[in-house]
Amino acid sequence: MRHLKFALWVIVAAFASSWQASAQATQPLPKDAAVKMGTLPNGLTYYVRKNSLPEKQAFFYIVQKVGSVQENESQRGLAHFLEHMCFNGTTNFPGNGVIEACERFGVKFGENINAYTSTDETVYNIDNVPATAENIETCLKILHDWSNSLLLEPDEIQKERGVIHEEWRMRSSAQQRILNNNLEKLYPGSRYARRMPIGLMSIVDNFTPDTLRAYYHKWYRPDLQAVVVVGDIDADQIVAKIKEIFSPIQNPKNEAKYEDYPVPSTMKPIYVVDKDKEQGQAVIQAMFKHDPMPKEYRNTAAYLITEGLTDIMTSALNARLNELSQNPDCPFVGAYVDDGNYLISKTMKAFTLIVVPKPGKDTEAFRVAFEELQRARQFGLTATEIDRAYNEMVSQFERIYNNRDKQRSPYFIQQYVHNFLDGTPMMSIEDSYNFMKMVGQQLKQAGALTEGCNSILKEYTASTDSNFVVLAMCPDKAGIAVPTESQLADAVKAALSAKLTAYVDNVKNEPLITKLPKKGKIVKTEKSDFGYTCWTLSNGAKVYYRQTDFNESQVLMQARSFGGLSYAKVNSKADLFNVRNASTFIEQCGLGSFSATELDKALAGKQASVSAYIDRESEGLDGNATPKDLRTLFELTYLKFTNPGSDRKAFNNYVESMKTQLANVEAVPEMAFRDSVSSTIYNHDPRVKIYKSADYDMANFDQMRAFYRERFKSPSDFNFYFTGNFNVDSLKQFAEIYLASIPSAGKREVLKDYGLHKATGIVDNRFTRAMETPKGNIIQVIWGENPYSMKESATVDALGDVLTQRYLKSIREEGSMAYSVGAQGEASYGSKEEYLIYVSCPVKPAKADSALYLIDLGLKEVAKDGCTKEELDKIKQFNLKNYADNQKVNSYWASLIRSKTLWNKDLHTGYEAVINGLSSDDLKNFVNNVVLKKLNRLTITMLPASLKE
């Protein structure tokens, strides 16, 4: 209730009339009138909304207010197990029927149909469903069966045990193990201490089917469920269907009482320090626990104001911590704050400070970050800091508001899911925007915005005794000292007693470009492909643009040029390191005369960004903006060419950050595997080496910046592409000022082959690594040279999808060898035209050879018999659905014009005919006449040094 009282104080401060303001603050906020919401007699809640984007598609969710915290001791892991079983047989869809039914209308398992289980909730989704009457009926029946009609057959349960075990294995990371090992300390006296959703493998491997059924029938019931349907639908008809299909479901007799499980307050601080051999770097968290806003007040102005002030406060404080991290003598590479759930529980929140120390400076880093928190608490965040964070929040709201009539369905779905689970508001975009704008303006006029943010910071961080937790996750490596609990406690005491001075907010009050360049001009205008127009500028640059109304708040910009690393002069390892990393590092170094910190402050409240890259055979820019910030987009683009970052402090900090991230990387098996994959594929070419911590000693600011400038020295070498909602006259004006004005070399570089060659023949790289949790991992790459065409691209893509369907059945469902397995086929063009089939299979170590056999068998079966009509029809439906959706996506058209103008590849015209024309023989012939004719198969297998779990 403290947070409610605080919110009421803020409202009174802003609106003066205390009685009226306080009363209004706790009244329910208006519900979005566009959503049809109701509750059936059996208690099931429904949310239905018509929304036309994506066109002719609908989204179906069923939300359960139950998770692992509802399990008893003999059921640990069964909430998550039950989630899996929803895809393994229901009354109306036995066996694999749920997935098969969805895939028939182009909905892909894992991508469009999925689920998740947490401690407090379980949510199932079927996305991007073509909204025909038949498909809608099917999806509602699936939701019905998930709610009440699972078969839970013993043989299906038995097969799924192994899949769950492999998911546990795959997700067993260093941080996960540390958390698991210390939950009892972090949650004293709480049920959450023994309710991690993955559960205990001893229970997963041995529970009886009746135990699972008991959990299902006890907790999966209408009064704890909600059905959410959003899409291009008739909402009234959907509501009627929901009533028809779900009303007959009854709650169990003598139903179990549903309750939230509290996290008890702790009167003394909790310090936990643990280490793991695979923990890459130290991470220290200080958590100030606090009660969440009571559910009955979450749909109120009091809740929204509290959340808004918290967001502004954390944003401002994070900007300050980031600025501190740029100092060369700062002992941490990064620190930030957040307010959210306390670890895995929703019934306790926490304001959390997270610190990533530089190697060997764990305690000092924690103390310095904690001091900065105390500085903000003692002296307050400044009005200018708060204003920047507030302006940034307003600009984000404006972006959503301006595109309110073209929001895609997932935006609304998340609102309704959280409303059901957490009681949070579901106002219309208009009401939300007007409310936040009105409250913000009133708070600013009353002088209460800064005071409110600082008051909430003080409230959250009031005690380092009661409800205070410090958790340190550290590497377990010889030579790396791990801080003790007492050392961290002493660091907190030192920070609390430190004599601090107020923070000074240094702001560079000048424009990004102090003197506008002499503008150039457009010398030629011509029509291009796909509705684009092309301007040729006086300096030789080309600008392609297309106005769209797909997203009222979006302008996309790309710039592309041939060149890249293929034009670099490399005579040493250091040369190679610096040219490979040039764009990444220089991107951290500010822009123009602005340091990295100054640039962040200057751009606060502006929705515009531009990033540069240098690839193997090209370089370019990628940017986006809202229409009102189009000039800023051009200013940033101009500076990327004429005056890239020169902030050496930021450069050095980034070097230290990378060295810290990679300090213990050799102990992380996944990193060794990544390195082996790239080395095997490219014949151990040093140009694909994954760098380690010591390699960053080669980082040279001057060399990187010089290579960056050389790659971006001449706009005549570039094509610029603009797609979205902009005024053409403004675009023309800005193109002449900021692009045509850049001095040019007057010539275009041509494509040059970088000379990076994949290994040929049959290559098998198998190795072992010491692991804390034994894991197997397989990557197989099959590739070859092959002329590119839309037909070949569609064929190899379909081949990957067919193989995925078969591997899921043979390796996951029938073999229980893996949790995640799949194949991806793609055809590429550039300096080389190739196809590639990429198979990924994290696997049970003892089953690695069996999985490899089945991977090989899948390809041989296609070579012998092709694929079934059903397999191919699923793929066609999925691709055609995505193609239709892409017609109103800016990035799709931007990619088409780039492919056409740079490579003369038309990836659009005739696509539907190509997909519809795909046949089993196409796949069969491709495998026999292309893949097997000259087989290049590269297999990388990593296994544990010991199989002991």
Annotate each language-model stretch with its function.
Residues 101, 149-152, 156-157, 445-456, ...:
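Peptidyl-prolyl cis-trans isomerase
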Residues 85-93:
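Metal-associated gating/positioning segment near the N- to mid-region
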